[in-house]
Amino acid sequence: MIKLLYPKFWQKRNIIAYLLLPIGLIYKFLGYLRDSLARPIMLPAKVICVGNCSVGGTGKTQIVMYLAKLLRAKNVSFVIVTKAYGSNLKSATTIHPGHTALEVGDEGVILAKYGTVIATKNIKEILPLINELKPDIIIIDDFLQNPYFYKDFTIVSVDSQRLFGNGFLIPAGPLRQDPNKALDAADLIFLVSSTNDKIPNILTPYVNKVISAQIVPSNNIDKTKNYFAFSGIGNPERFFSTLKNYGLNITGYKIFPDHYNYLQEDLENLYSLAKEHNTTLITTRKDHIKFNDLNNNIVCLDVELSINNHDLLNEKIFKKAQIFN
């Protein structure tokens, strides 16, 4: 799997973006060809698919966590399906305690605390496991662009700062697909931020299905200390912004590629940086789980989703999707 950082030209067009544009057009054609030839399967339960239009963190994991807690509160049986990014997974697997991020992906390990999770790289491989578990609902994390299964309800997650970047498809830009196509088809659009941002003009036509959501800390962090922050996630800027909005003093930071698998050398270098800055290391839950027993001196910031339009969420999911009937 290719590890990528989010290049600056993905947000603001420059000569590199234009030079890569022809490859983006090929990417678009291949996507069209795949969609045209696909024969989607009907999964044996209602499907809620949570995805995004672009590469990089848009808060999908927090949305899935929120939905899992919502379904559990309603006593609805569900299974979460995750894509096992950054893992060496060979076939679809139900995640159990003891599985590592390298085996099933960092997101899978985190989501397993909220319900039964299947990690897979091929959506069709989940069928035997779903038939065995017999859930009422399947929450699928990512796979939004996957045409090989039917979706009953789709949620598109949009980062409030990056939005759709420079508007170009991979690799000229961050887009996986035409955002208008995804937004038109979406049942709900989550605008995710670390502050209470206003709905941008580009989402105004979809205001009736936009839910503003904030990523907020869910655990207490000592605000009297100084911290050196690091992360290997899709949107490190939002992580750093969350730390500052929480009132922490961040003396420095280091960014690793998304879904990065840390080496012992990385850990040693991080401790050296912390010592140099006379600070404590702090990172995300996705990163923290990769250090196993070696992370005792690293502070972990846990986050959750806070939304301001529960009525819209209830109307769309409970009534329109009728998933609880």
Swiss-Prot record:
Coiled coil: none annotated. It catalyses: a lipid A disaccharide + ATP = a lipid IVA + ADP + H(+). Signal peptide: none annotated. One of its GO terms (molecular function) is ATP binding. Pathway: Glycolipid biosynthesis; lipid IV(A) biosynthesis; lipid IV(A) from (3R)-3-hydroxytetradecanoyl-[acyl-carrier-protein] and UDP-N-acetyl-alpha-D-glucosamine: step 6/6. InterPro entries: LpxK, P-loop_NTPase. GO terms for cellular component: plasma membrane. It holds the Pfam family LpxK. Its EC number is 2.7.1.130. The keyword Acetylation does not apply. Keywords: ATP-binding, Kinase, Lipid A biosynthesis, Lipid biosynthesis, Lipid metabolism, Nucleotide-binding, Transferase. The keyword Magnesium does not apply. Transfers the gamma-phosphate of ATP to the 4'-position of a tetraacyldisaccharide 1-phosphate intermediate (termed DS-1-P) to form tetraacyldisaccharide 1,4'-bis-phosphate (lipid IVA). Belongs to the LpxK family. This is Tetraacyldisaccharide 4'-kinase. It comes from Rickettsia akari (strain Hartford). The lineage of its organism: Bacteria, Pseudomonadati, Pseudomonadota, Alphaproteobacteria, Rickettsiales.
